[in-house]
């Protein structure tokens, strides 16, 4: 989890904590080491090596004829995507997602041409290294959904790359089929080494935010997923068996899946600061291989959106025995927050947005209302606790005056706790409902930046709810400002911050509880936090800031309604009645009694120290 997300959690915690006081108080094989992961420069160099430089059949054997040819292209496609295949290396040359565009409203290509490279390393019978990228494949068959590319090694000896699409599916089946090549390859070759590289294009308007969510992700064969660091260059040697390796952007991914397992991998993620690309990922890995085995080696590529429900569906279809768990590509937070998103937020959001011409702004409003209604009992309980503390304020002030001075601090606290016990008030009661709401706020904080349903959806002045909206934008380089604010001001973020200040002001006008006296800096902190949140959330999705805005406005409305419904004079009368009853029958309140007893012992210890 990156530091910006952690900072976000801290900000949310402090806002909730402050309002609580205001309202109450985780060995690469030798061959892999010889063939390290491909960088863009090395790939360009390798592809630019003319085949004419190497003519000797001593190196290529019966594959030598396939080193000569002309690169041609063939296309397979369905309603969702178009894949161009190259006869040079038999690789996927480009992938276009038909239903999506980039932030410039141009066709969305995950990669094209030399932005990606793919190579399989074979060992010939005379122990020479053969790279699939050096050969020209023959087009054996081609239909709209399937293409067979063949690497010939003489009469009736070949290796086929079979690419298959399915209607309305982002998953590509890829089979490596060997036929009568036992005499062409080394019998000591027990693994196939694979190299894969891809540059990640900038697809979204908010580059820095997109960089934060672009991560090289991989899944262990029988375990959970892990990621390389997203904020800087990272290289990792993974000796464990892997199930898949994913090149993830904020909203789209390229995932390489093997039906058996990857033996190990060297993974490399490079952070590209400028230009049309944000990251460069490369992998050097291997899979088990038996030259005598005539069964096809099966793989899959997933080229598509990071849609939680779509990715989850692959574990319920023909790939369910693979236990892919591709949905974990979507960052939804740690276990508790992820559970809230999986079980509550995502189902409600999908239900609200299921249909044509859905207004996403209205959907977010309804989602906010549903969450607020679900949390209403906790909110009301917190308000009542705050009201009790407020009506007891005069009596608490009398205790403070009667037992003023540092030497009587323990007596003062003891008498205050005794008052709370007598009237049946626990000063901590108001904190618990606020704290119980925190997981929902953090879950939503994680959900909105990952919600592809918001992408390119407009609402009011925001053209795209998945990125920041722009009230003011500038190109002038202002010292220090871009680091903290970017080159724009988000109107939704500004309104959210103003609403938070209004909420703070409204509460501080009426809340006069002990917390403000014990923590005199808390009031200033609560006014300062919306300013900090403005700088922090200014580049976050407009959908998230819109949610925070209406959530804060609803909170203000709730507080106004609660004040009108709760008669503080009647509430004080009930507390006084409880006080009279407590003088007749001493009632144990658990926490309050333990706190009072602790203070009494502290007072006795203090007296003993003074006598010494």
From Swiss-Prot:
Pfam families: 60KD_IMP, YidC_periplas. The keyword Nucleotide-binding does not apply. It is a multi-pass membrane protein. One of its GO terms (molecular function) is membrane insertase activity. It is found in: Cell inner membrane. Keywords: Cell inner membrane, Cell membrane, Chaperone, Membrane, Protein transport, Transmembrane, Transmembrane helix, Transport. Required for the insertion and/or proper folding and/or complex formation of integral membrane proteins into the membrane. Involved in integration of membrane proteins that insert both dependently and independently of the Sec translocase complex, as well as at least some lipoproteins. Aids folding of multispanning membrane proteins. PANTHER family: CYTOCHROME C OXIDASE ASSEMBLY PROTEIN COX18, MITOCHONDRIAL, OXA1. Belongs to the OXA1/ALB3/YidC family. Type 1 subfamily. This is Membrane protein insertase YidC. The lineage of its organism: Bacteria, Pseudomonadati, Bacteroidota, Bacteroidia, Bacteroidales.
């Amino acid at each position: 989890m990156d530091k910006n997300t952690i900072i976000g959690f801290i900000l949310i915690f402090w806002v909730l904590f402050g309002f609580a006081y205001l309202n109450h108080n985780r060995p690469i094989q030798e061959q892999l080491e010889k063939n390290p992961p491909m960088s863009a420069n090395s790939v360009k160099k390798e592809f630019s090596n003319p085949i004419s430089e190497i003519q000797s059949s001593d190196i290529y054997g019966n594959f030598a004829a396939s080193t000569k040819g002309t690169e041609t292209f063939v296309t397979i496609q369905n309603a969702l995507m178009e894949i161009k295949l190259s006869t040079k290396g038999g690789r996927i040359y480009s992938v276009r997602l038909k239903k999506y565009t980039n932030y410039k409203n141009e066709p969305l290509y995950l990669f094209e041409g030399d932005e990606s490279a793919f190579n399989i390393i074979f060992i010939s019978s005379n122990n020479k290294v053969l790279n699939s990228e050096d050969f020209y494949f023959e087009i054996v068959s081609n239909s709209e959904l399937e293409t067979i590319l063949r690497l010939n090694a003489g009469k009736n000896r070949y290796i086929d790359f079979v690419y298959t699409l399915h209607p309305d599916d982002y998953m590509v089946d890829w089979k490596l089929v060997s036929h009568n090549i036992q005499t062409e390859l080394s019998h000591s070759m027990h693994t196939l080494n694979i190299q894969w590289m891809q540059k990640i294009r900038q697809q979204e308007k908010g580059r820095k935010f997109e960089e934060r969510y672009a991560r090289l992700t991989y899944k262990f064969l029988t375990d959970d997923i892990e990621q390389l660091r997203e904020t800087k260059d990272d290289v990792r040697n993974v000796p464990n068996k892997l199930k898949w390796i994913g090149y993830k952007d904020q909203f789209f991914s390229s995932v390489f899946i093997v039906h058996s397992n990857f033996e190990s991998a060297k993974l490399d993620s490079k952070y590209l600061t400028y230009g049309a690309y944000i990251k460069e990922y490369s992998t050097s890995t291997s899979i088990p291989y038996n030259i005598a085995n005539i069964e096809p080696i099966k793989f899959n590529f997933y080229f598509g959106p990071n849609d939680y429900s779509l990715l989850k569906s692959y574990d319920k279809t023909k790939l369910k025995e693979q236990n892919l768990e591709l949905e974990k590509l979507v960052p939804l937070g740690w276990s508790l927050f992820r559970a809230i998103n999986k079980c509550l937020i995502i189902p409600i959001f999908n239900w609200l947005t299921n249909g044509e011409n859905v207004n996403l702004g209205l959907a977010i409003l309804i989602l906010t209302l549903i969450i607020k209604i679900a949390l209403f009992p906790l909110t009301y309980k917190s308000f009542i606790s705050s009201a009790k503390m407020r009506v007891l304020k005069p009596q608490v002030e009398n205790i403070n005056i009667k037992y003023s001075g540092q030497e009587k601090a323990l007596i003062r606290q003891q008498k205050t706790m005794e008052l709370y016990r007598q009237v049946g008030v626990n000063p901590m009661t108001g904190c618990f409902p606020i704290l119980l709401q925190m997981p929902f706020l953090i879950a939503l904080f994680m959900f909105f930046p990952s919600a592809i349903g918001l992408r390119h959806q407009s609402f009011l002045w925001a053209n795209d709810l998945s990125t920041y909206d722009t009230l003011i934008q500038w190109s002038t380089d202002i010292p220090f400002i871009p680091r903290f604010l970017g080159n724009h001001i988000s109107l939704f973020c500004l309104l959210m911050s103003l609403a938070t200040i209004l909420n703070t002001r409204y509460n501080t006008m009426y809340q006069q509880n002990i917390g403000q006296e014990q923590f005199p800096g808390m009031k200033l902190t609560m006014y300062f936090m919306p300013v900090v949140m403005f700088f922090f959330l200014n580049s976050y999705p407009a959908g998230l800031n819109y949610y925070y805005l209406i959530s804060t406005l609803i909170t203000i409305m709730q507080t106004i309604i609660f004040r009108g419904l709760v008669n503080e004079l009647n509430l004080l009368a009930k507390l006084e009645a409880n006080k009279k009853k407590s003088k007749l029958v001493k009632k144990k309140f658990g926490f309050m009694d333990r706190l009072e007893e602790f203070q009494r012992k502290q007072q006795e210890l203090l007296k003993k120290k003074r006598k010494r």
